[in-house]
């Protein structure tokens, strides 16, 4: 299978940005970070996006996702966690090579923090709401992914596991 668009999917705080940058360096492909691209597309600062109502932010995230997908390959992109919620977006994800960066719920809560783009939800949600979101989205991420990586404590090791999967023929990453 040949792919030239790698989509990193998973919850907020999974490490899409960190792992995406490492993969970009390893593969010599551009990396499109959701937060950076969202800020550029909207013309809003990260701080302004971080204060935006969640529903409005999700609309912008969907527009950003579609805009990134329209770009020429090859590239790696970190996809906003909310994009998985709509079937039309899941269909687009399934059309590319998606890598699910999976981690346990406790790690999601710990990593997500309470500030930054998309973190509005964590400021107002209790653990049961975060658990509900995880329970709802986890199978959706898994169903859309062609490769799932159970994350370790090292982003470098996780990126190397992805590169190894690319190199052993699970997918072709030659651009």
Specify the residue positions occupied by each region the protein language model found:
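Short glycine-rich anion-binding loops that position phosphate/pyrophosphate groups of nucleotides
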Residues: 80-84, 104-106, 154
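Conserved glycine(s) of the Walker
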Residues: 15
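A glycine- and Lys/Arg-enriched "phosphate-lid" helix/loop adjacent to the NTP-binding pocket
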Residues: 95-140
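Post-Walker A helix-loop "phosphate-sensing" segment adjacent to the P-loop in P-loop NTPases
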Residues: 25-34
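ATP-dependent small-molecule kinase phosphotransfer cores
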Residues: 33-92, 118
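P-loop (Walker A) phosphate-binding loop of NTP-binding proteins
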Residues: 11
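Hydrophobic anchor at the beta1->P-loop junction of P-loop NTPases
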Residues: 8
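NTP-dependent small-molecule kinase module
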Residues: 1-2, 18, 22, 26, ...
């Amino acid at each position: 299978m040949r792919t030239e668009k790698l989509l990193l999917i998973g919850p907020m705080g999974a490490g899409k940005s960190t792992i995406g940058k490492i993969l970009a360096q390893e593969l010599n492909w551009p990396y499109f970070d959701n937060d950076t691209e969202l800020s550029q597309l909207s013309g809003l600062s990260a701080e302004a996006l971080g204060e935006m109502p969640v529903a409005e932010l999700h609309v912008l995230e969907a527009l950003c996702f579609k805009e990134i997908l329209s770009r020429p390959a090859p590239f790696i992109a970190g996809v906003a966690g909310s994009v998985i919620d709509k079937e039309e977006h899941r269909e687009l994800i399934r059309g590319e090579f998606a890598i699910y960066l999976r981690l346990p719920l406790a790690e999601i809560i710990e990593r997500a923090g309470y500030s930054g783009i998309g973190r509005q939800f964590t400021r107002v949600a209790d653990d049961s709401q975060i658990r509900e979101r995880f329970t709802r989205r986890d199978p959706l991420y898994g169903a859309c992914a062609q490769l799932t990586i159970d994350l370790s404590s090292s982003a470098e090791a996780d990126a190397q596991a992805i590169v190894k999967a690319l190199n052993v023929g699970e997918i072709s990453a030659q651009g």
